[in-house]
Amino acid sequence: VGCPVGCIFCESGRNGFVRNLTSSEIVQQIILLRRKVNRIVFMGMGEPLFNYDNLIKAIHILRDRYGLNFPTDGITISTVGPVDQLKKLREEHLKIQLTISLHAATQSARNRIIPHMRIYAIEDVVKQALSYSERHNRKIVFAYLLLPGINDRPSDVRQLAKWFRGKKVMINVLQYNPTSNSRIKAPQKREIVAFKHQLEQAGLEVTMRVSHGREINAACGQVAKT
């Protein structure tokens, strides 16, 4: 409930952090849907890896044939990448999908975008994510919310290419969903398309995520504790 990370584009941490969910509360969210679920993504509000033990226990229950018997390939953890927890996750025999909320190509830009994660060097986050990919033979998705004037420079493209060209990586360029932070300038769609093209020209695999739920303030970055 709430979030301690403090991304500048996200409402989830606006009113602070209250507590982590228990493993049973996590699993119950799937059960309460009362319909066929073919994909589970741990994201929305909060940092999953800061609730590591309950998260891993919930995933084991979801995967267990006496639990929900959910396929491993259908489970994704979306994380800002706390390095110690990424190292632990690498050693788990889960082989789940991993998305890293990177949002920057330099330490200074990431410190600005995700200020409460400045204790983790961006190079270490990238290194551990790629190590997970190599160990488990999984393509890693790096989420990149485009913020004009902050993370959209040609040097950012070059750095991303230096890290990820030739790796099992996909860059997911995200659109900013409006929040109460009036200081953020949302990019035009043409700017997002142009940045995507620059990344592709640099030899990277890139996609653009279509955001759902914006009309009810339930899209990525808009979910807040009330």
Model-derived features: positions:
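Auxiliary Fe-S-binding modules of radical SAM enzymes
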Residues: 130-141, 146-226
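Alpha-helix N-cap and loop-to-helix initiation/capping positions
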Residues: 21, 50, 54, 116-121, ...
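Hydrophobic/aromatic residues located in beta-strands of well-ordered beta-sheets
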Residues: 40, 75-77, 98, 140, ...
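Conserved radical SAM core fold
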Residues: 46-49, 68, 82-86, 95-119, ...
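Short, solvent-exposed amphipathic alpha-helical segments in soluble enzyme
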Residues: 91-94, 116-117, 159-161, 225
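Conserved Radical SAM active-site core
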Residues: 1-96, 106-108, 131
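Glycine-rich S-adenosyl-L-methionine
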Residues: 25-28, 116-131
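Alpha-helical scaffolding segments of alpha/beta enzyme cores, especially the outer helices
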Residues: 28, 32, 54-61, 88, ...
